[in-house]
Amino acid sequence: MLFMLDEIMTPREACDRWGITQEALRMKLKRGKDSELVDKLIREGKLKYYRPIEKKRGEWILTVEAMKILFPKSNRSFIIK
């Protein structure tokens, strides 16, 4: 699965483009992990989480496709700058 660079975002950019808070995204990713949705999106190559072994926190990389699945009602506010 190939994505154009403007379809790949940091969590901050995804929140800005979808008009949601970072807390809303964090909660959605946590709930999605509990329901296996996040694992499915990771397997499909639509999300990526990386955490170095020596660190406690990691980094997310999100795609437009993943955001459309996680926040379907917010699609109307999707803005590409």
Curated annotation (Swiss-Prot):
Superkingdom of the source species: Bacteria
Matches recorded under Pfam families: pXO2-72
Protein keywords: Plasmid
InterPro entries associated with the record: Plasmid_pXO2-72
Protein name: Uncharacterized protein pXO2-72/BXB0098/GBAA_pXO2_0098
Species for this entry: Bacillus anthracis
